[in-house]
Amino acid sequence: MSLQYGAEETPLAGSYGAADSFPKDFGYGVEEEEEEAAAGGGGGAGAGGGCGPGGADSSKPRILLMGLRRSGKSSIQKVVFHKMSPNETLFLESTNKIYKDDISNSSFVNFQIWDFPGQMDFFDPTFDYEMIFRGTGALIYVIDAQDDYMEALTRLHITVSKAYKVNPDMNFEVFIHKVDGLSDDHKIETQRDIHQRANDDLADAGLEKLHLSFYLTSIYDHSIFEAFSKVVQKLIPQLPTLENLLNIFISNSGIEKAFLFDVVSKIYIATDSSPVDMQSYELCCDMIDVVIDVSCIYGLKEDGSGSAYDKESMAIIKLNNTTVLYLKEVTKFLALVCILREESFERKGLIDYNFHCFRKAIHEVFEVGVTSHRSCSHQTSAPSLKALAHNGTPRNAI
């Protein structure tokens, strides 16, 4: 395996000019406690994208983490967004208040996560659930697959029924969690049983239009990142544009698979239209870890200043099966990770030129670094990849 670093081409006009990308702790920041259940964090439109980091909290879609006590809600939040080791989550205390976590370090992975205590009483007159649900983009209900889930299914039905009546545009996601201790057959049977019972309860209540999405998850593998990627993608209005840009890029560059990663959380916010192979996704996640770890050792200055990931970040890893992993910085918190064959990588000049066009298009979509305050009602037009090269020949349009 070889690891190479190279200097990025001339920075794009309008690109961010900060010397450092990530803070030294390389994370999203300190968790904020929500002191009152019905206070603060007002609601933007259900599945709409948030404004830039400088925008008001009310502009950001919310993701609610709900479920019974000890189902793993806080562990999921800590592992995905705060880089906590899964083994350390064993020492987390049970949540007894609503905690709000502001995820706003990039131009579009920009939302709030509200972690709810296990026994939330919707009939408590002091709990304004209508206000909370009205400003929510997605509700994630976590079910412990290793425990008796009948009570969890009852609470799931009560929760999604009330939420749907307040905000029918909300996305409803069910994490069948802690499946690492189950056999493959048991996982499939548990998912089938929970899926059947939950949808039967909704049908009996006349809520056939309410759609639940189910995911098998564990914090001890990449399944929780894969599931959260799917949840976050539904909150990104620019997702079709991103997928289209990735499809154009890989088809003109001889690349087999490409992911657009949020580097901090390792959530992929977009990929091309080909099916996602879990092994490929895990390989790309591991590459990000390797690049950041090596950069932290060799890329920082003697006084510890600098950043492990910045506008010059680029890495190539060649595997012994003729597969090449190629990572390039796209924006301040985004990286493009590609999987391709060694023979395709011989045309690196073509790939780099097409990547430059792709990167410029991404900057145009999100206007990264142009302004920190953008009205949420403003809709940025999606650019096309002009002058993209195919087989080494530039052309005016695609």
Curated annotation (Swiss-Prot):
Coiled coil: none annotated. One of its GO terms (molecular function) is enzyme-substrate adaptor activity. It is found in: Cytoplasm; Nucleus; Lysosome membrane. Residues 39-55 have a biased composition (Gly residues). One of its GO terms (cellular component) is FNIP-folliculin RagC/D GAP. Signal peptide: none annotated. Expressed most abundantly in kidney. Moderately expressed in brain, ovary, and testis, and detected at lower levels in heart, liver, and muscle. Not detected in lung, spleen, and small intestine. Widely expressed in tumor cells, with expression being specifically up-regulated in highly metastatic cells. The activation of RagC/RRAGC is mediated by a GTPase activating protein (GAP). In high-amino acid conditions, activated by GTPase activating protein FLCN that stimulates RRAGC GTPase activity to turn it into its active GDP-bound form. In response to amino acid depletion, the GATOR1 complex inactivates RagC/RRAGC by securing the GTP-bound inactive form. It is an enzyme of class 3 (hydrolase). The modification Phosphoserine is found at residues 2, 15. The modification Phosphothreonine is found at residue 95. Its EC number is 3.6.5.-. InterPro entries: Gtr1_RagA, P-loop_NTPase, RagC/D. The modification N-acetylserine is found at residue 2. Keywords: Acetylation, Cytoplasm, GTP-binding, Hydrolase, Lysosome, Membrane, Nucleotide-binding, Nucleus, Phosphoprotein. Residues 1-56 are annotated as: Disordered. One of its GO terms (biological process) is positive regulation of TORC1 signaling. Guanine nucleotide-binding protein that plays a crucial role in the cellular response to amino acid availability through regulation of the mTORC1 signaling cascade. Forms heterodimeric Rag complexes with RagA/RRAGA or RagB/RRAGB and cycles between an inactive GTP-bound and an active GDP-bound form: RagC/RRAGC is in its active form when GDP-bound RagC/RRAGC forms a complex with GTP-bound RagA/RRAGA (or RagB/RRAGB) and in an inactive form when GTP-bound RagC/RRAGC heterodimerizes with GDP-bound RagA/RRAGA (or RagB/RRAGB). Belongs to the GTR/RAG GTP-binding protein family. Forms a heterodimer with RRAGA, in a sequence-independent manner, and RRAGB. Heterodimerization stabilizes proteins of the heterodimer. The GDP-bound form of RRAGC (in complex with the GTP-bound form of RRAGA or RRAGB), interacts with RPTOR, thereby promoting recruitment of mTORC1 to the lysosomes. Component of the lysosomal folliculin complex (LFC), composed of FLCN, FNIP1 (or FNIP2), RagA/RRAGA or RagB/RRAGB GDP-bound, RagC/RRAGC or RagD/RRAGD GTP-bound, and Ragulator. Interacts with NOL8. This is Ras-related GTP-binding protein C. It comes from Mus musculus (Mouse). The gene is Rragc.
